[in-house]
Amino acid sequence: MATWNDLNDELNRWQDTGKDATFWWRDDDAIEPTDLLERLIQISSENTAPCMVAVVPHLAVPALTLRLNDAPTIYPAQHGYRHINHAPEGQKATEFGDHRNRTVLENELRDGWQSLQSFNRLAPIFVPPWNRMTDELNGYLRSIG
C-alpha cells in the first residue's frame, strides 16, 4: 500500500516536470464549528487550497455560517437536508432515493438550498448523503440553482 510519503514524492516529481495535480477535497456532514473543521480551514488557508464543505441545511447552526463566511478558501455546498437514511431495510443508505415521494424530495431540496443562501461562496452543488440519490432529481436540481 502507498504511504503519504509516496504521494508527496510523486507530487514533487510532478512539480519538477512542471505538472500540476488537480484534486477534489471535501468535508462532509458540517453542522457546527468544531476543532476538526477549524484544522481543515487552517490547512486550506495555509496552502491556498480551496475546500468544499458539505453542510447539512436542516441541522446547521448560525455559528457555522459565520465561521465559513470568514474562511475565504472554503466553499459550502448543500449536503442533503436532514442527513437521515430513508432507505427501506436491506437497501443501501440514501436520503433522496426513489422510494420517497417526489414532491417531498423536491420540497426538501428547495428548502435546504434556500436555507443556505446566507453562506458566502455557496457552491451550486448538491452532495447527496451516502453519495446516492435518484436520477429523477437531476432536472429539478438544475431548476433550483
Would you name each region that the model predicts?
Residues 50-136:
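Metal-dependent polysaccharide deacetylase catalytic core of the NodB/CE4 family, i.e.
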Residues 141-145:
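His/Asp/Glu-enriched short active-site or ligand-binding loop at hydrolase and phosphoryl-transfer sites
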